[in-house]
Regions:
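Structural signature of tandem-repeat unit edges
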Residues: 1-15, 24-37, 47-60, 69-83, ...
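Consensus positions within tandem repeat domains that build extended binding/scaffold surfaces
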Residues: 17-22, 39-44, 62-65, 88, ...
Length: 177
């Protein structure tokens, strides 16, 4: 599959099966607007891909779907519920994610130290706190060693500290507002 450069799928196609386009190293463009399911290793080692845009509908992306796609530098996630966990994207260098504020994509970016940009404004969002939509604190990315966890972050009330939230950090004290 080294000659394939572009995939244009009709709206009737909503799923891409496991390994479907694996090692299509010349693939540069694919329309994923109507896709709701992407199988594991579906685009494994598609080194020609530089950008991905996931559509308005939630997309179920299986394990390592984009693993080895070493040249992807921009992922746009139009649906706030689409998760990028386990997709293979966290291993990429020079990746930026564009999505909605307080989305699952932003949480993924924050957890993995990937630059995140607001889809509406294009502005880079830098958070000290890694917090999900249910108020769970998953980490702190600031420089302080004595930290005070705020009552809310980005309008979300904090109610729990997540697993390994401060593991291997340089924090010396934690207090809650």
């Amino acid at each position: 599959c080294t000659a394939l450069t572009k995939i244009n799928l009709p709206a009737s196609v909503t799923a891409i099966a496991s390994g479907a386009f694996g090692s299509c190293t010349s693939l540069e463009s694919i329309n994923l607007d109507n896709i709701s399911s992407i199988g594991k290793f579906a685009f494994y080692n598609c080194t020609g891909l530089t950008e991905l845009t996931l559509g308005e509908n939630p997309v179920d992306i299986s394990r390592k779907a984009f693993s080895g796609c070493s040249n992807i530098t921009k992922v746009t996630v139009k649906n706030s519920e689409t998760s990028l966990d386990s997709t293979g994207l966290a291993e990429l260098e020079n990746l930026s994610i564009y999505g909605h504020i307080n989305s699952v994509a932003q949480l993924f970016a924050d957890k993995n130290d990937i630059p995140f940009y607001d889809l509406k404004t294009g502005e880079r969002i830098i958070n000290e706190w890694v917090v999900d939509n249910e108020g769970v604190v998953w980490g702190y990315k600031g420089n302080e060693t004595d930290i005070v966890i705020p009552r809310e972050v980005n309008g979300i009330a904090i109610n729990k500290i997540g697993e390994n939230a401060f593991a291997n950090s340089k924090i010396t004290s934690v207090e809650m507002e």
